[in-house]
Amino acid sequence: MSRLQTRFAQLKQDNRAALVTFVTAGDPDYDASLEILKGLPAAGADVIELGMPFTDPMADGPAIQLANIRALQGGQTLAKTLRMVREFRAGDSDTPLVLMGYFNPIHHYGVERFVTEAKEAGVDGLIVVDLPPEHNEDLCHPAQAAGIDFIRLTTPTTGDERLPTVLEGSSGFVYYVSVAGVTGANAATLEHVEEAVARLRRHTDLPIGIGFGIRSAEHAAAVARLADGVVVGSALIERIAKAGDTARAVKDVLALCGELAEGVRNAR
């Protein structure tokens, strides 16, 4: 079993959801970002999504757009992001790590080179927001052939007739974007989330992670009662932006992760 399969299977046995945390590689700088990454599992993160900075993150809201800018201005590159994963893996062989971002930087890096180096670094999965199933040959198939899960996004506007196409070839887990729009937008109602999870379960046996708009331990707990994973990104990123210095940024992000983890673990 892959690290993602193992983690979700274990959590299912424990009757709780996964806390999935998103941070942008290189934000606020390389060293602090690596420190955050290394600290997340002990703070309570079950799965980590690491953003690959890009100049035009069109699906992301203001908080993550600014994180991309901070990271890129600090010199973060895709090669450095893969190095960061290797450094993380040197001390953690258990926590699943997923790279999330856009196809353009991967295309420029070279798909074959990227997939090979990502696998060697210890990447478990990919979420590429601007690569629909019609382009599976571009990255999904090469990644899965190398043993890297390819995680699809579904949204409130993904109809029943479209879902099988989106889910075909998906692996790892399904990421349900509970609000149509950019990341960090207002949270969806729990009733809406419950209906969406039920609809997705009719189409897939994969674990379902819910993201976009989750900001507090209470909200995380409420979503954790309905889904297999609770994805939090913008709320963590905002702590970095407000911190003022890197040491405070590390401390504040890990503190919020701890609060969210407590909410998720006490949910059921």
Swiss-Prot record:
Q: Where does the record place the catalytic residues?
A: E49 (proton acceptor), D60 (proton acceptor)
Q: By its UniProt entry, which InterPro entries does this protein fall under?
A: Aldolase_TIM, RibuloseP-bd_barrel, Trp_synthase_alpha_AS, Trp_synthase_suA
Q: Which EC number(s) are documented for this chain?
A: 4.2.1.20
Q: Does the keyword Ribosomal protein apply?
A: no
Subunit structure comment from the entry:
Tetramer of two alpha and two beta chains.
Q: Which HAMAP family match?
A: Trp_synth_alpha
The molecule here is called Tryptophan synthase alpha chain
Q: Which organism is it from?
A: Pseudomonas paraeruginosa (strain DSM 24068 / PA7)
The gene it comes from is trpA
